[in-house]
């Protein structure tokens, strides 16, 4: 539906500027969740159009396949399933997206992102699964929190015997999403970048620029 120029030159630029009206006009005048919808389309292209994208979106669509409602509160925005290949193991990628500003981002996103991934890992026991958090602006303390999750246990609040030792959360700003589309990066190229970034020991204030921005 969206070509490369529209995704990078129009939609992603609107995300950066928080121009919600223009985003809705390009997707659907009645669409409440265009951010998640466009990100799903973008990631489908990155994944070389593999998989059941309509299932992965976790959106209710209208007759024109445009979004009406977003994921339920207990579920990630996009849940992408990958079968094992020579490039990566079988895993699930949870994708969370927000246009929250710098003041609200930490409060709004840190808890639900960690909760969605933690619950998924406890339920599936596939520790190769992880989360990408996409946003127009990254608060340094959000980066710090997500990096700390690498070694922080997450417990099932109803059963303390059920927990995971840590989790992998990769934050991405809109500028990097634009770069991914502009240079036609594919998921099999991004996966090792994310894995190396996850295993890095750099402190949070150095980590994003060195491990994500400069690698994409």
Predicted regions and their residues:
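Catalytic core segments in nucleotide and nucleic-acid processing enzymes
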Residues: 3-216
